[in-house]
């Protein structure tokens, strides 16, 4: 399988040299680093080229790296049922940079791009209806950004007296504390009181 993915990477780089910055094969999937302003043409090529035929858009997401000048990675996942292969396209964009929508090539990108906009605040130019999809219309901020406060900005609750949903600023009964526990996946090297199973 890695040989087939390396051949695919070589084919794409040969046919779309201006769109690809680099590639790697990890965990049985090919990742292409893409020039942001070439994304639409590359996606069209991956869909229509006979050696590719990546006709299924699986997901679009983003990764926040606040310490980098190009803060976000926008990541596209595609599937070729004809070639039985997956491909990941990854591009770095600045916070003030827009990304071209691939809605014209994959109409299902509509929902994924709206989600990325809602969660990260990344704007997609050429999108037919770029508005929030998971949070309320008046929601402040973008909750998947690493600088978004854990408590949020607004508390939403049903008020029994007013018989409606009310929005209020978050009021913490005690100062917010950040706990630094051991990872639950690494497991503890001590026995908790009352944990009889650990002693047997």
Swiss-Prot record:
Signal peptide: none annotated. The keyword Membrane applies. It is found in: Cell inner membrane. Its EC number is 7.1.1.-. It is a peripheral membrane protein. It is an enzyme of class 7 (translocase). Gene3D superfamilies: NADH:ubiquinone oxidoreductase, 30kDa subunit. Keywords: Cell inner membrane, Cell membrane, Membrane, NAD, Quinone, Translocase, Transport, Ubiquinone. The keyword Ribonucleoprotein does not apply. It catalyses: a quinone + NADH + 5 H(+)(in) = a quinol + NAD(+) + 4 H(+)(out). GO terms for cellular component: plasma membrane. Pfam families: Complex1_30kDa. GO terms for molecular function: NADH dehydrogenase (ubiquinone) activity; NADH:ubiquinone reductase (non-electrogenic) activity; quinone binding. InterPro entries: NADH_DH_suC, NADH_quin_OxRdtase_su_C/D-like, NADH_UbQ_OxRdtase_30kDa_su, NADH_UbQ_OxRdtase_CS. Belongs to the complex I 30 kDa subunit family. NDH-1 shuttles electrons from NADH, via FMN and iron-sulfur (Fe-S) centers, to quinones in the respiratory chain. The immediate electron acceptor for the enzyme in this species is believed to be ubiquinone. Couples the redox reaction to proton translocation (for every two electrons transferred, four hydrogen ions are translocated across the cytoplasmic membrane), and thus conserves the redox energy in a proton gradient. HAMAP family: NDH1_NuoC (MF_01357). NDH-1 is composed of 14 different subunits. Subunits NuoB, C, D, E, F, and G constitute the peripheral sector of the complex. This is NADH-quinone oxidoreductase subunit C.
């Amino acid at each position: 399988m890695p040989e087939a993915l390396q051949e695919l990477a070589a084919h794409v780089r040969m046919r779309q040299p201006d769109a690809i910055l680099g590639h790697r094969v990890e965990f049985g999937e090919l990742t292409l680093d893409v020039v942001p302003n070439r994304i639409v043409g590359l996606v069209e090529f991956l869909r229509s080229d006979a050696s590719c035929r990546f006709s299924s858009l699986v997901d679009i997401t983003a990764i926040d790296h606040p310490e980098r000048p190009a803060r976000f990675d926008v990541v596209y996942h595609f599937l070729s049922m004809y070639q039985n292969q997956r491909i990941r396209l990854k591009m770095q964009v600045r916070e003030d940079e827009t990304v071209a929508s691939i809605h014209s090539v994959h109409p299902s990108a509509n929902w994924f791009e709206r989600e990325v906009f809602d969660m990260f605040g990344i704007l997609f130019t050429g999108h037919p209806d770029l508005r929030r999809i998971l949070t309320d219309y008046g929601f402040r901020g973008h909750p998947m950004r690493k600088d978004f406060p854990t408590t949020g900005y607004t508390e939403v609750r049903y008020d029994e007296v007013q018989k409606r949903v009310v929005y209020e600023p978050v009021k913490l009964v005690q100062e917010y504390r950040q706990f630094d526990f051991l990872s639950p996946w690494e497991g503890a090297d001590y026995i908790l009181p009352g944990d009889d199973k650990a002693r047997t």
